[in-house]
Amino acid sequence: MRTEANSLSQKVRDLLQTPAVRRWGLYLLKAFALLAVLLVLSRFAPAMPTPVIALFWFGLSAIASLNFAYCAVIRKTLKRQKYREGGRLHRFNEGRKLWIFLGFVVSAACMAGLLLELPKWDAAEWGFVVAAVPLYLAVLLVARWRLRREYEPTFLPAGVIRWTGVITCILLCAAYAVFIALEPVSPFISAREVFDAVRLPFDESPSMLVSEAGMLVSLVDGVTMLWVSEAAVTYFLAYLIWRIVLVAATFFSITNLLGVCALQLPEIKRIFMPLERIGEDDVPRHMKASHLAWFAAFPLAFFLLFVGIDAVYSDAMKDSELTYAEQFVRDR
């Protein structure tokens, strides 16, 4: 009996040491750690002071931007084959600043929307987000198996990540459409009832800019709920499509973050290395300090800018009866 137990224990240890199990186990660990961070933010973000919420915002944005930057580097690697070394196009193609910046800006916009929506999520939305973790892995494994016959090894990971993100997002939207179609619709009687039902989680936020953004988002939510409530009764297909469009941005942000969790460290390092030529995989290359510096500089600059603008705006609104967002909402 003891021999059988030792044999089983050894088999389990051997299984855990296999590259595939270690890689995808690490993905699950990173993905669920990410969900834990999002859960904490959903509970405490409305009460976080400006520097703390800015730290989470731009930290998540920097992480999410790795996916954009990695795909951009792979495209640059392909383009490198047609440029002569020493030419202007070759030097421009070797650069990273533009794509690191654009990837960070797009990620910051996505993360801002995600942070403002997190406190409003109900159990159903959290269920979809949690289900996205194993769904993404399942789609990735199938995509990797199918695409390895289509891509060269240098370009396979980027192709797999890109297709996995698209397919996972589509599947989540399709599942959400079924959920909405089965959900009973309760139309609102009046506009006042709609706006009374709108949640204002950031109304008392210590950050004036976050509070203002939350108020404007809640206004948009109210107008959307009013239109959707009416459309659900008379134009159900339009109602269904609009609900899917609204949630698609959230699913895109989540799948993008999961894509970063699926990237291995050597793939992330390629973002900061000189571009390789096809067939030169064994040539030693090292990360460039300038690329790393730019990647760190953008989040830091945006962090300082946000904290500074928030302080100036808070001071300017200190003696005002209504802020700009409050006045805008009242006028509407």
Language-model segments: residues:
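Individual transmembrane alpha-helix segments
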Residues: T224-T250
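Membrane-interfacial helical/loop segments at transmembrane boundaries in membrane proteins
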Residues: P184-V233, M317-R332
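Long, hydrophobic alpha/beta structural blocks
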Residues: W126-R192
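Transmembrane alpha-helical insertion/packing segments
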Residues: V21-A143
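Internal/C-terminal transmembrane anchor helices
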Residues: R162-Y176, R285-D310
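Cytoplasmic membrane-interface regions of multi-pass membrane proteins
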Residues: R2-T18, F68-N93, L140-W163, C261-H286
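Alpha-helical transmembrane segments and their membrane-interface junctions
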Residues: F104-W126, Y176-V194, A301-K318
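N-terminal membrane topogenic signal
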Residues: L15-L29, M287-L292
